[in-house]
């Protein structure tokens, strides 16, 4: 049976400090327990998200993994904790709390979890310092970053040095949507989650390509959450724009050339969407991801991959587990600590 690696899962420390009491700002996420197995993530005094102990308890996660046939989870922070809006030193402390917790969780269960860190990208020098600590001291396998930093797209020159160092150190980057575009038009129907997230993810991918980041740093390893959002669908439109507006070009080749280097998780809920992703980028560039433990997650993880009849057994095996390890620079068969 194919090994199953759930690349897209989120975790938060049960005892995350109350940063409102330590630093200025009311936007710090605070975990308020509602019972022994439940809590609210509070932001600015309002409930941002209701969560269960699945989001902090490794033991509960392993129970669910065993029940759903998942061998390994890749742990990453919840995007609301990125705290890009805060003073860099305060945000660095928030990053350290989470990175240390994730690293400790991996050390407790090294055969079940792989860790990704977070860095305060509002200050690139501080973020590079924490990225180095994550990889070289904590043993984390990559860094999760948001799709924008305080409204700046990822091709903004402010982030050039970060991407340069990520490429130099061969650090995989998992790009996850947060603070989506058009929020003022999305308060109803939870449009932020169903429309905003796909649109925001597509904009991030397009920015990295059209802004020249991928041409400048061709060895960057980048994986987009949520199947890349609407990016796979709009890629031909991006190519057309590149061809008809030569005066706007910042790259020597059309977007589809650079897009082939991207990885994507499989979280698009539908076999036709998954087939488009594979047709456009190759099955080797798709990793299984469920968004555990949140409400919109795929249950069981890998369900759509299993149901996509056009895939061979070898292709499914790659998507369900092997591609994630390859992306994270973990040699298959040599153990997670290699």
Model regions: which residues?
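Catalytic metal-binding/acid-base residues of hydrolase active sites
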Residues: 10, 148, 178-179, 228, ...
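Active-site gating/metal-coordination segments in enzymes
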Residues: 71-205, 211-212
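Hydrophobic faces of well-ordered beta-strands that scaffold small-molecule active sites
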Residues: 5-7, 73-75, 114-117, 143-145, ...
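Active-site region of glycoside hydrolase catalytic domains
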Residues: 208-221
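Active-site gating loops and adjacent loop-to-helix segments of metal-dependent hydrolytic enzymes
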Residues: 13-53, 181-201, 238-261
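Acidic-and-aromatic substrate-binding clefts and catalytic sites of carbohydrate-active enzymes
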Residues: 51-56, 83, 121-127, 150-157, ...
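Short acidic/glycine-rich loop or secondary-structure boundary segments that cap or lie
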Residues: 183, 231-235, 240, 272-274
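Mid-to-C-terminal alpha-helical segments outside catalytic/metal-binding sites
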Residues: 2-7, 12-72, 100-108, 129-133, ...
């Amino acid at each position: 049976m194919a090994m199953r690696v759930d690349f897209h899962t989120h975790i938060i420390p049960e005892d995350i400090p109350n940063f409102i009491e330590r630093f200025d700002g009311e936007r710090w996420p605070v975990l308020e327990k509602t019972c022994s197995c439940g809590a609210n993530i509070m932001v600015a005094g309002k409930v941002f998200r209701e969560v269960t102990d699945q989001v902090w308890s490794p033991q509960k996660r392993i129970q669910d993994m065993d029940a759903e046939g998942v061998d390994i989870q890749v742990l990453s922070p919840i995007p609301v904790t990125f705290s890009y809006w805060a003073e860099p030193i305060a945000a660095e402390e928030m990053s350290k709390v989470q990175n240390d917790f994730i690293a400790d969780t991996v050390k407790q269960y090294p055969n079940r979890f792989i860790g990704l860190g977070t860095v305060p990208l509002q200050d690139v020098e501080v973020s590079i310092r924490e990225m180095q600590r994550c990889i070289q001291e904590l043993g984390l396998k990559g860094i999760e970053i948001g799709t924008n930093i305080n409204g700046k797209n990822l091709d903004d020159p402010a982030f050039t040095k970060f991407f340069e160092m990520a490429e130099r150190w061969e650090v995989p980057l998992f790009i996850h949507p947060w603070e989506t575009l058009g929020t003022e038009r999305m308060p109803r129907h939870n449009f932020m989650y169903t429309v905003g997230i796909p649109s925001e993810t597509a904009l991030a991918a397009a920015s990295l390509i059209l802004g020249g980041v991928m041409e400048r740093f061709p060895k960057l390893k980048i994986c987009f959450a949520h199947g890349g959002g609407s990016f796979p669908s709009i890629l031909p439109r991006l190519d057309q724009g590149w061809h008809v507006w030569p005066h706007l070009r910042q790259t020597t080749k059309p977007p589809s050339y650079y897009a082939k280097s991207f990885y994507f998780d499989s979280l698009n809920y539908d076999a036709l969407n998954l087939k488009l992703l594979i047709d456009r980028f190759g099955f080797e560039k798709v990793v299984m991801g469920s968004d555990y433990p949140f409400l919109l997650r795929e249950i069981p993880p890998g369900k759509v991959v299993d149901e996509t009849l056009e895939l061979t057994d070898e292709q499914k095996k790659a998507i369900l587990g092997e591609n994630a390890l390859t992306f994270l620079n973990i040699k298959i068969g040599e153990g997670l600590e290699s």
